[in-house]
């Protein structure tokens, strides 16, 4: 006869890996063209001048320069721009 109960299976034990979202280059920082500025879900930050948008809403620099954050429009949307260096 068994001295211990059988170790049944559990329905837990899974977790998704971290997605590493957020701001990668901060205001005033010098970055090169193609550098990722913000990784995000949806458009929390909108592209300004010299900033492109990837298919997963990632914002990246189109030119070398300094990053600047600001707001735009009546709804005060957060924008990210790159000023050429």
From Swiss-Prot:
Pfam families xref list: Ribosomal_L27
Cellular component terms per the entry's GO annotation: cytosolic large ribosomal subunit
Gene Ontology process terms (BP): translation
Keyword Ribosomal protein: yes
Residue ranges of the region described as Disordered: 1-20
Compositional bias per record (Gly residues), positions renumbered to this chain: 1-10
Listed Gene3D superfamilies: 2.40.50.100
Keyword annotations of the record: Ribonucleoprotein, Ribosomal protein
Keyword Ribonucleoprotein annotated: yes
Molecular function via GO: structural constituent of ribosome
Family in the record: Belongs to the bacterial ribosomal protein bL27 family.
HAMAP family found in the cross-reference section: Ribosomal_bL27
NCBIfam families from the UniProt entry: L27 (TIGR00062)
Protein name according to UniProt: Large ribosomal subunit protein bL27
Provenance organism: Paracidovorax citrulli (strain AAC00-1)
Gene that this sequence comes from: rpmA
């Amino acid at each position: 006869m068994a001295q211990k109960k059988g170790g049944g299976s559990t329905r837990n034990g899974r977790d998704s890996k971290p997605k590493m979202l957020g701001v990668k280059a901060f205001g005033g920082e010098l970055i090169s063209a193609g550098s990722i500025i913000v990784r995000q879900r949806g458009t929390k930050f909108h592209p300004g001048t010299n900033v492109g948008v990837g298919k997963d809403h990632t914002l990246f620099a189109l030119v070398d320069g300094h990053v600047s954050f600001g707001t735009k429009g009546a709804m005060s949307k957060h924008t990210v721009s790159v000023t050429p260096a």
